């Protein structure tokens, strides 16, 4: 199955929207993408004080976000990894 050409932009926009809904400072959410072969890495940047909201209790929130994007990628025959990055 061939991935749609706009898919990485859609993935990046979706991750940004999900993150903005979780944090206290949504204007500071930034997502950068990095292509590694068939793997798309989405680096999510938030303010240090918002990291806990994205990680969640015992890492449950970031785990759920990663599972969601893994499933989205699997559907298109590719791997999508979400990394919580720091500046």
Question: Could you tell me what each predicted segment is?
Answer:
Residues 1-53, 63-87:
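RNA-contacting regions in translation and RNA-metabolism proteins
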Residues 55-59:
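Glycine-centered tight-turn and secondary-structure capping sites
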């Amino acid at each position: 199955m061939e991935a749609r050409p706009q898919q990485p932009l859609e993935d990046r926009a979706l991750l940004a929207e999900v993150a903005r809904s979780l944090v206290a400072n949504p204007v500071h959410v930034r997502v950068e993408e990095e292509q590694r072969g068939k793997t798309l890495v989405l680096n999510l940047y938030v303010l240090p004080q918002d990291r806990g909201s994205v990680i969640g209790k015992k890492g449950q929130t970031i785990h759920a976000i990663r599972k969601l994007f893994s499933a989205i990628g699997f559907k298109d025959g590719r791997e999508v990894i979400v990394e919580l990055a720091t500046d």
